């Protein structure tokens, strides 16, 4: 039989018995690790007290209500063994209370659907209202803790409402509170706590009312006051997205984020291509089914109708520009598939495509890759079934032609956007020459035909062309002589420089240092004849060669003198690029005279010609040689030479601007090259800049011996020339003034002492010789020589006075005391004339710098200076052949002489063409000014000046060295 069992704690009135039961249930039998610390043991004491409150007190209402403090003291008194700590219970409970405050709390702020009310709870042991919340357990995350605590306190599951990104977190009194924001909870839900004796009340509160009466009403709130501001902001944001459009966009964004779709959707090209191929295969299978006699279904017929409609639309679009299409690249491929639009033609290797039709180069806007080495010249065969059209060279300037390829149209694919096609202008090659990508002659002709001739001044000016084999340069030169034009300033510079340039006839011969003296005398005789027979047209041809952008310049031909003179025009540039880049800009600007291009452009062109002439042989240039010349003077080499020139020019401050400071002499120092052959050395250094050989690199340079020179002196001059890095520009000016006189004096009449003159003595002699009129006999020469001695001293005094006036500008300069003695003072006044002539200045050569140093005085003396300069011109010039022309340019004679000394780079001021005929000049234009008169005077000086046994050394003065020093300091 069984004994009926009664409830253990039912009708029990003894508190000790109840505590013994709870002691066995919650404390004695707990794991040892839970008794390892005071806090963990007190957690079990707390659970036992909750059990007493929740269950035993309900069964026996007469039992006393016990708090955790009194309940713990009773348990320890009943069983002291459970408390093994050396601490009092009340102190342990205080530590436990502090520990509980450090445990994080997770809860939820629950709003209704209208976001107007919030759900709050009130605890059984508290009189304040707060969010449903609870302490986080061991190894529990925030979301799970929030869901668990809310479900225990109000009985509502937040799993479908909670968002881990929307929460408010605060630290209050060292305790972390994290409240998740929940919206959309229905107010009709029956909230009921799941735990006993923990939650007393659950109510909805108006949020706006709470925010206004939080600190005024008697109702107490906990955590709400510290979180009111972020709650209000969150509600405002939630109300804004409540609108229908915003909700839709918000839902769409959330859906995209959920599906992993970004805002910028990337189209997969592989998938699109696969879909296109599937569509084409499906359409092909449908056509095969129809051709096999199978009756398609109604759906297939509808699909075919839609495709045919799309085909018609595409045909209409293509018919609008079909007339502008290029001929098919694949004529043999596209014709068999013209009737069947859905069949893709077989592929063809690219090599065969390029070999079968060379138009592929033109239609693909140039070569897509390197040309095939196995390509053969194609010839048109009219007997073939598909004749190959005329080859078209590549058009590099044409845009790409999308309609060039005759690929069959795949109508079942998605129709691409049709753009306006570009037509290619046909450029057929000659029929007798097969198309070949390796023909340098054809490529050079094509490039030369497209280059604009921007430097051509008149339509009659001949173009430079590359000579073919068998072509004589003499025939071309004779045709060009009648058509060339030349300005007066260029003719003047050519007349001054011609004796120097005429020494280059034997440039292609071996070094003359190994020749006897008789050979040297013969060479100089040929120089004199060449100077007398030179024409102005050759200077214009040289200017065309300098300004031309084409590279076919300077064909060296040995047999004739005219051909040698043509080659002489390029030799100075070759030497300038080989020896000294710094002197290149100055010597070239002096030698070649005025030009429209800037100094840097001139130097670049001269350097490019010099680089070209290094690799050129003295033979007729054919097609292949012309192609090599074209390759050797590319733009890259021009750019490199220009950079080297600019870097070298930067080393000296004014070396490209001031020709008189080339040797960098100190103030007051006189150039001291007084060796017995310094005159020849000075002249040969200037000649060396413009008369070196035009041969292949590493070939010895050619020197022309002067009369009286020895091989030993030439060797010394060569060493001195190699060691000198900067050529004296003042000696270049001396050479310009010396050449017209030295070329007219015969070798039998020249004194041997003239071979040993220094540069300063010769420039003084030149300035004195310019004031000598046309001599009639030796007596006039003697009287003129005495006058020149006085004029030289006056010239030195005037230049010294001008030097003082420059350094002290406040002191007045008086020229009246010198203005009435002789005509040489006109030249001195011109040298001091102020820069008020009206001629435009050109900053590109040494001549402009010399004119700047000569024109710095007051403009109040202009009338008297003009009178003196006119007298000087009348005194210097012989009577010309034609006195009928007048000065139309309204410029006085001082302007004209100053512009001639300046170099007169403004070519627009001179429009006359001067043709040299037997030493005399003919002026054919009415616009000729006084510079033409001076030009005629200088040209006629060869027949006008005849001074036998003239000793230059007798006219040298001690002040000439000081004159040259003053010129150097300027």
Curated annotation (Swiss-Prot):
GO CC terms, sorted: cytoplasm; cytoplasmic side of membrane; nucleus; P-body; RNA decapping complex
Ranges of biased composition (kind: Acidic residues): 528-539, 625-637
EC number: 3.6.1.62
Protein name listed in UniProt: m7GpppN-mRNA hydrolase
Region called Disordered, residue ranges: 302-341, 417-465, 501-520, 528-692, 831-867
Gene Ontology BP annotations: deadenylation-dependent decapping of nuclear-transcribed mRNA; deadenylation-independent decapping of nuclear-transcribed mRNA; mRNA processing; nuclear-transcribed mRNA catabolic process, nonsense-mediated decay; positive regulation of transcription initiation by RNA polymerase II; stress granule assembly
Keyword vocabulary terms for this entry: Cytoplasm, Hydrolase, Manganese, Metal-binding, mRNA processing, Nonsense-mediated mRNA decay, Phosphoprotein, RNA-binding
Composition bias type Polar residues, residue spans: 577-590, 677-691, 848-863
Effect of mutating residue 740 to S: In strain: YJM269 and YJM270
Reactions that this protein is recorded to catalyse: a 5'-end (N(7)-methyl 5'-triphosphoguanosine)-ribonucleoside in mRNA + H2O = N(7)-methyl-GDP + a 5'-end phospho-ribonucleoside in mRNA + 2 H(+)
Family of the protein in this entry: Belongs to the Nudix hydrolase family. DCP2 subfamily.
Effect of residue 547 to T: In strain: YJM280 and YJM320
Subunit structure: Component of the decapping complex composed of DCP1 and DCP2. Interacts with mRNA, LSM2, LSM4 and LSM8. Interacts with EDC3.
Protein species of origin: Saccharomyces cerevisiae (strain ATCC 204508 / S288c)
Sites of Phosphoserine modification: 116, 439, 679, 682, 751, 771, 773, 778
Motif Nudix box per record, residues: 134-155
């Amino acid at each position: 039989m069984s004994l009926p069992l009664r409830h253990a704690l039912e009708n029990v009135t003894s508190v000790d018995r109840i505590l013994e039961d709870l002691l066995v249930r919650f404390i004695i039998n707990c794991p040892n690790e839970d008794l390892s610390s005071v806090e963990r043991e007190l957690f079990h004491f707390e659970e036992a007290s909750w059990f007493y409150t929740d269950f035993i007190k309900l069964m026996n209402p007469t039992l006393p209500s016990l708090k955790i403090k009194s309940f713990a003291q009773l348990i320890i008194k009943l069983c002291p063994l459970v408390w093994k700590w050396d601490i009092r219970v009340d102190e342990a409970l205080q530590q436990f209370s502090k520990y509980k405050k450090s445990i994080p709390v997770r809860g939820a702020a629950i709003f209704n659907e209208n976001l107007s009310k919030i759900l709050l709870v009130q605890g059984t042991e508290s009189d304040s209202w707060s969010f449903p919340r609870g302490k986080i357990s061991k190894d529990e995350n925030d979301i799970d803790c929030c869901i668990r605590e809310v479900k225990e306190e109000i009985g509502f599951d937040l799993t479908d409402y909670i968002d881990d990104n929307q929460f408010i977190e605060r630290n209050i009194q060292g305790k972390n509170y994290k409240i998740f924001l929940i919206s959309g909870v229905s107010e009709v839900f029956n909230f009921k706590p799941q735990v006993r004796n923990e939650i007393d009340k659950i109510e909805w509160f108006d949020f706006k009312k709470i925010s206004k009466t939080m600190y005024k009403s008697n109702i107490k709130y906990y955590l709400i006051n510290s979180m009111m501001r972020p709650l209000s902001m969150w509600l405002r944001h939630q109300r804004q997205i409540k609108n229908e459009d915003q909700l839709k966009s918000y839902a769409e964004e959330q859906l995209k984020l959920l599906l992993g779709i970004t805002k910028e959707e990337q189209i997969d090209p592989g998938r699109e291509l696969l879909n296109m191929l599937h569509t084409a295969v499906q359409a092909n299978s449908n056509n095969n089914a129809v051709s096999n006699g199978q009756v398609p279904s109604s759906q297939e017929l509808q699909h075919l109708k839609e495709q045919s409609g799309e085909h018609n639309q595409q045909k209409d679009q293509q018919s609008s520009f079909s007339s502008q299409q290029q001929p098919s690249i694949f004529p043999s491929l596209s014709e068999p598939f013209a009737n069947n639009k859905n069949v893709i033609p077989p592929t063809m290797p690219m090599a065969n495509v390029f070999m079968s039709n060379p138009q592929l180069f033109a239609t693909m806007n140039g070569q897509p890759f390197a040309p095939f080495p196995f390509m053969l010249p194609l010839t048109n065969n009219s007997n073939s079934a598909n004749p190959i059209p005329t080859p078209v060279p590549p058009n590099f300037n044409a845009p790409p032609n999308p309609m060039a390829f005759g690929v069959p149209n795949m109508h079942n694919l998605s129709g691409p956007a049709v753009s306006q096609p570009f037509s290619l202008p046909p450029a057929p090659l000659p029929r007798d020459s097969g198309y070949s990508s390796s023909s340098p002659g054809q490529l050079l002709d094509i490039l030369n035909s497209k280059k604009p001739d921007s430097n051509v001044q008149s339509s009659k000016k001949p173009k430079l062309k590359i000579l073919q084999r068998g072509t004589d340069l003499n025939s071309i030169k004779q045709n060009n002589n009648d058509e060339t034009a030349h300005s007066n300033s260029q003719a003047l510079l050519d007349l001054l420089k011609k004796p120097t340039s005429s020494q280059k006839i034997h440039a292609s011969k071996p070094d003359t240092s190994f020749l006897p003296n008789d050979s040297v005398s013969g060479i100089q005789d040929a120089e004199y004849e060449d100077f007398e027979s030179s024409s102005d047209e050759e200077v214009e041809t040289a200017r065309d060669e300098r300004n031309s952008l084409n590279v076919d310049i300077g064909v060296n031909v040995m047999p004739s003198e005219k051909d040698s003179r043509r080659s002489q025009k390029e030799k100075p540039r070759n030497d300038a690029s080989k020896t000294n880049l710094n002197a290149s800009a100055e010597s070239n600007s002096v030698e070649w005279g005025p030009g429209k291009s800037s100094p840097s452009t001139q130097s670049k062109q001269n350097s490019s010609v010099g680089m070209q002439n290094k690799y050129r042989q003295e033979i007729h240039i054919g097609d292949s040689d012309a192609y090599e010349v074209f390759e050797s003077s590319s733009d890259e080499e021009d750019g490199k030479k220009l950079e080297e020139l600019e870097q070298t020019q930067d080393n000296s401050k004014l070396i490209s601007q001031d020709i008189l400071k080339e040797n960098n002499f100190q103030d007051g120092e006189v150039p001291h090259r007084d060796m017995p052959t310094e005159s020849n050395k000075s002249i040969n250094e200037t000649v060396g800049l413009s008369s070196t050989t035009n041969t292949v690199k590493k070939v010895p340079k050619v020197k022309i011996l002067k009369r009286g020179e020895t091989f030993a002196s030439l060797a010394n001059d060569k060493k001195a020339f190699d060691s000198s890095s900067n050529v004296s520009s003042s000696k270049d000016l001396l050479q310009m003034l010396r050449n017209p006189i030295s070329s007219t004096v015969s070798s039998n009449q020249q004194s041997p002492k003239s071979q040993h003159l220094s540069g300063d003595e010769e420039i003084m002699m030149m300035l004195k010789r310019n004031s000598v009129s046309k001599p009639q006999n030796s007596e006039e020469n003697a009287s003129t020589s005495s006058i020149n001695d006085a004029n030289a001293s006056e010239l030195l005094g005037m230049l010294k006075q001008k030097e003082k006036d420059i350094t002290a500008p406040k002191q007045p300069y008086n020229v009246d005391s010198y203005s009435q003695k002789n005509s040489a003072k006109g030249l001195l006044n011109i040298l001091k004339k102020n820069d008020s002539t009206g001629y435009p200045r050109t900053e590109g050569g040494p001549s402009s710098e010399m004119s700047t140093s000569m024109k710095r005085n007051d403009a109040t003396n202009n009338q008297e200076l003009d009178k003196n300069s006119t007298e000087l011109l009348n005194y210097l010039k012989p009577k010309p052949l034609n006195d009928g022309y007048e000065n139309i340019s309204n410029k006085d004679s001082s302007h004209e002489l100053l512009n001639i000394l300046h170099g007169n780079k403004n070519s627009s001021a001179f429009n006359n063409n001067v043709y040299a005929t037997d030493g005399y000049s003919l002026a054919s234009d009415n616009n000729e000014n006084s510079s033409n008169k001076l030009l005629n005077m200088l040209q006629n000086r060869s027949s006008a000046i005849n001074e036998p046994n003239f000793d230059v050394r007798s006219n040298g003065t001690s002040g000439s060295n000081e004159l040259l020093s003053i010129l150097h300091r300027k």
